Amino acid sequence: MFNNPDFSDIATCDLEEPKNSIKIEREQVKLEKRLCREVGRAITDFNMIEEGDKIMVCMSGGKDSYTMLDVLRKLQKRAPVKFELVAVNLDQKQPGFPDHVLPEYFKSIGVDYHIETQDTYSVVKRVVPEGKTTCGLCSRLRRAILYKVADELGCTKVALGHHRDDIVQTLMLNMFYGGRMKGMPPKLVSDDGKHVVIRPLCYVPEKDTVRWAQYQNFPIIPCNLCGSQDGLQRVAVGELLREWDKKFPGRVESMFRAMGHIVTTHMMDPELHDFKNAKATGIADPNGDMAFDHEEMPVSASLPGLQVVQLSS
């Protein structure tokens, strides 16, 4: 019986040292090590993969799903447990979808795969009024179909290609437009209780999947074939975060880390903390006096010319 196998020590995957000392080759090797390390760490931290698992790797044809499949295959060769991978693509019959691209790629790398063809595009276009967003219904239909395919293939886990930036964007979207603090969990059980969904790229920043896709020259399929205008809010938030990270490097990473360090007593959710019955007990509380303290934050190195004067008390 394997309990939370450790993938974090196989960061080198099956790397070969670059034959030449060209800068781009060194960068590629460093990036591959980093991707394997971060995915391995996520798998270990959240016990994503266990002995005998059959992982359904959901493939959209975008940079993130290609990167996820590539890294999982590399980790599979040296993992402390045995598991299977099957790449699955849902062909929703969107106009112009190049249905030959993914099968040809899967055959070229020798991975088991399944193409599920379901014309959800026509259903969505028929049901959703003109000018309204189609992504919500499309997503629900796609999820139901993929769960059915997972059952048919005997898969124990469903792997999605959401990366760190997707998770932070989702948190911000829910805060800005939904009035709640909710992101994307690294691992969850589906609503019907039958499927475990994992996000192996949860520690990986988007810039790394972009760069890796460029290095590997993956045959990318565009994500706008359906013509939907949904996601404008997500695009806007994504641009905001990217611009913010340029001005204040490390802020997006800090926001991501914050999602794993929730101080429930300092939020406002009565379901998480009993504020109504909070009373003085006479027992010292290390967080108690902080209610009156101004919390000191590190000064950003990206603010040139700012001199911080330390005042003596």
UniProtKB/Swiss-Prot annotation:
Pathway: tRNA modification. It is an enzyme of class 2 (transferase). Pfam families: ATP_bind_3 (PF01171). A motif (PP-loop motif) lies at residues 60-65. Its EC number is 2.8.1.-. Keywords: 4Fe-4S, ATP-binding, Cytoplasm, Iron, Iron-sulfur, Magnesium, Metal-binding, Nucleotide-binding, RNA-binding, Transferase, tRNA processing, tRNA-binding. GO terms for cellular component: cytoplasm. One of its GO terms (biological process) is tRNA thio-modification. One of its GO terms (molecular function) is sulfurtransferase activity. It comes from the Bacteria. Binds 1 [4Fe-4S] cluster per subunit. The cluster is chelated by three Cys residues, the fourth Fe has a free coordination site that may bind a sulfur atom transferred from the persulfide of IscS. It is found in: Cytoplasm. It catalyses: cytidine(32) in tRNA + S-sulfanyl-L-cysteinyl-[cysteine desulfurase] + AH2 + ATP = 2-thiocytidine(32) in tRNA + L-cysteinyl-[cysteine desulfurase] + A + AMP + diphosphate + H(+). Its cofactor is Mg(2+); [4Fe-4S] cluster. [4Fe-4S] cluster binds at residues 135, 138, 226. Belongs to the TtcA family. HAMAP family: TtcA (MF_01850). The thiolation reaction likely consists of two steps: a first activation step by ATP to form an adenylated intermediate of the target base of tRNA, and a second nucleophilic substitution step of the sulfur (S) atom supplied by the hydrosulfide attached to the Fe-S cluster. NCBIfam families: PRK10696.1. Homodimer. Catalyzes the ATP-dependent 2-thiolation of cytidine in position 32 of tRNA, to form 2-thiocytidine (s(2)C32). The sulfur atoms are provided by the cysteine/cysteine desulfurase (IscS) system. This is tRNA-cytidine(32) 2-sulfurtransferase. It comes from Delftia acidovorans (strain DSM 14801 / SPH-1). The lineage of its organism: Bacteria, Pseudomonadati, Pseudomonadota, Betaproteobacteria, Burkholderiales.
